[in-house]
Amino acid sequence: MSVNPASVTNPPAQFPEDFVFGGATAAYQVEGETRTHGKGKVAWDDFLEAQGRFSPDPASDFYNQYPVDLELCEELGINGIRLSIAWSRIFPNGTGEINAEGVQFYHDLFAECHKHHVEPFVTLHHFDTPLPLFEKGDFLNRETIDAFVDFATFCFKEYADQVTYWFTFNEIWADASNTYIEGTFPGGVKAHLAEAFQCEHNMMLAHARAVLAFHNGGFKGKIGVIQSLEFKYPLNENDPADIKAANNEHVLQNQFLLDATFRGDYAPDTLECANRLAAISGGTIEILDEDLEIMREAALYNDYLGVNNYQCRFLKAYDGENDLHHNGTGEKGTGRWRVKGIGEHVNKPGIPTTDWDWIIYPEGLFDLLVYIKQRYPNYKQIFITENGMGYKDPYKDGFVDDQPRIDYIEQHLRWLLKAMEVGVNVGGYFLWSLQDQFSWTNGYNKRYGFFYVDFETQKRTPKASAYWYKHVAQTRRLD
């Protein structure tokens, strides 16, 4: 890093007047009604049913409760909301037949957003490829790219008068890693690095084609992609092996995707590392010349980057057998991530973690944002599209005192302001999540929301963090 954060002593006292203070959602995690109203199946439906641990129905019942949530947004000064359109609610089979009821649902939802002066920021894919396409290989099959571009183009046309801010994908890294490395998503493949890289590349090609469809179609508004990014630190900054481990995962999660976003191709150092890692699992990455032509053109038209960031990582060298265990229960200390040829996730003494073993180190957000600004000077704007803390929120006497979440958000916003002082252009911040939601791998005991949800009654209760956030949004400053 060429910027010393210790030298940034006077972050701006105020957020800009046009800064968005938002909350984030995802269709499958909030809507419920996963098999009704004409919606087609996704791989998660059968995957979760077979596990028998928890159900995505009714989740937060957002399909029916969205007027309540949006009214609360208006009352609490939340002026932006991240939403996703469930692809299979529009195209039940991914292509072909259109579900008119699903199309109308999103018209009604966006209208309600504007009624309450809450700007919708809309994502087209949030881990929910329609089942028929998933069964053909998901984004490892290039037919899915074609289908996604058709779906995206339909949405651009259909909702042109209601949606200004679009994102193509949510967290391409998480989709690839959870499906092909950690094995916690449908498919359940573990430690296949070549497939993870191929998934990342193909989804970035789909992003590029959708961006060009948006640009060439003359649609008003803006478009970008959301990447899940974490700054990687070597556990021992003086150990070449630890430095290499940190760089390995940095390329896998961050640099490969950011090169594709802002360069439209892959720098030599990126490609060398990616090919070396892919070979560990006995595979290669197919990158066609025509892919790069499309991606280079699209790189000119990214209006912003969405950054989902919850933590950083400390890595040390590891060359043993793959050992991956996801902490999906909140039993602290049970998570393990050791991948042969990449490295091992470790905790650094003195740095706190959550019950789900997530590192709390807000300075990592600063380092990440400055890295993006320095390596990709052609970036235009960044939105923090997810940041937040999973917590076992205690509900007592009609109130939720979630002071640890307030502390977490405040610390991250302070480091965000420091990044803005050194010239990073950030347009807004979205807490994950607006309300308590269904979690893909944790169910319902890991709560993130501003609004506490009683999942039996669907009653919403704003937490202490919601009132704190209202004050920040109204004053546009941190006290």
Predicted regions and their residues:
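Active-site region of glycoside hydrolase catalytic domains
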Residues: S2-A50, E74, N93-T95, V103-D479
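A common structural microfeature
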Residues: D18-V20, Y63, G80
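Aromatic- and Gly/Pro-rich amphipathic surface segment
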Residues: G40-L72, L76
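Catalytic domains of carbohydrate-active enzymes, especially glycoside hydrolases
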Residues: Q65-A86, L300-Y304, R375
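Glycine-rich, proline-tolerant flexible connector loops at the mouths of alpha/beta enzymes
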Residues: I85-I98
